[in-house]
Amino acid sequence: MTRAKSGKISKNRHKKILKLAKGYRGRANSCFRVAIEKVEKALQYAYRDRRNRKRDFRGLWIQRINAAVREHGLVYSQFMGALKKTEIAIDRKVLAELAVNNSDGFVSIVEKAKAHI
């Protein structure tokens, strides 16, 4: 009986890792031992940064809203407090989009919020 060495299975496993490592520098894209370490680390970074992306975008939206609101003589925290009082339920993502692309709509929201300060 012939000896089974899982040749096809390990070859496919190696191929899968090396495919994921395509584009890496040095031996990381051709040497399995190096590639597997780099791919594992890349997947860890990807997992971590999918969560960080949410934080980063929230910060970006807040910066954009703050910059747009300051042009109208308010501060971000005052504006958001006034929005809550007026019961206007628009999230930060949409507010930032309005501030950048639809300034007329944003100005009308700011005016309504100013009335409740």
From Swiss-Prot:
Belongs to the bacterial ribosomal protein bL20 family. Binds directly to 23S ribosomal RNA and is necessary for the in vitro assembly process of the 50S ribosomal subunit. It is not involved in the protein synthesizing functions of that subunit. Keywords: Ribonucleoprotein, Ribosomal protein, RNA-binding, rRNA-binding. The keyword Iron-sulfur does not apply. SUPFAM superfamilies: Ribosomal protein L20. InterPro entries: Ribosomal_bL20, RIBOSOMAL_L20_CS, Ribosomal_protein_bL20_C. NCBIfam families: rplT_bact (TIGR01032). It comes from the Bacteria. GO terms for cellular component: ribonucleoprotein complex; ribosome. It comes from Rickettsia rickettsii (strain Sheila Smith). This is Large ribosomal subunit protein bL20. Gene3D superfamilies: 6.10.160.10, Ribosomal protein L20 (1.10.1900.20). GO terms for molecular function: rRNA binding; structural constituent of ribosome.
